[in-house]
Amino acid sequence: DLNDHAAGGSTQATQGGHRYWCARDAMQSALQEPLQPAPSLEQATDQLEVVLQQAIAARMHSPVACGAFLSGGTDSSRVVAMMQAQSALPIEAWTVGFDDPGHDESDWASQVARHLGVHHHLHRMDSRQGLDLLQRLPQVWCEPFADASQLPTLLASELLGARKPVALTGDGGDELF
């Protein structure tokens, strides 16, 4: 069978398989527990920091090398900063810039990279390259979606993927926070 990946889930292939977490089961279990008082903003911030550090550490301490996407925004900058804090060597981060200054955040990304001491790879996508990527989208994505970031994400994935099998990103941070 072929199914969509559950939101918030991950897949690890093992002989015989094992499902270690299910959102529905977790929700039902949580509903059975007595309500706890909400943490303060400071406590919630501290908890989030710990969870993010653990998540990044788990991915960085894999047997394969990883890099990161760096847009210069808050989310990817935070991920890259946490990666660099956990690494003895400069990590590698990739940015896709644009010729249109209204859409280009590569200056911010370069400043973040310099400040953190990461090895920064900056690639400028021109309109020809954008059109080439656009024509390939039906073969790349398993279903259509309308997100302007899919072109630079695809390009960054290909650039990073040529050197690192794992990429960490800040995607989803805006929606979460």
Predicted regions located by residue number:
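N-terminal segments that mediate ammonia production and transfer
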Residues: 1-39
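ATP-dependent adenylate-handling active sites, centered on carboxylate activation for C-N bond formation
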Residues: 26-177
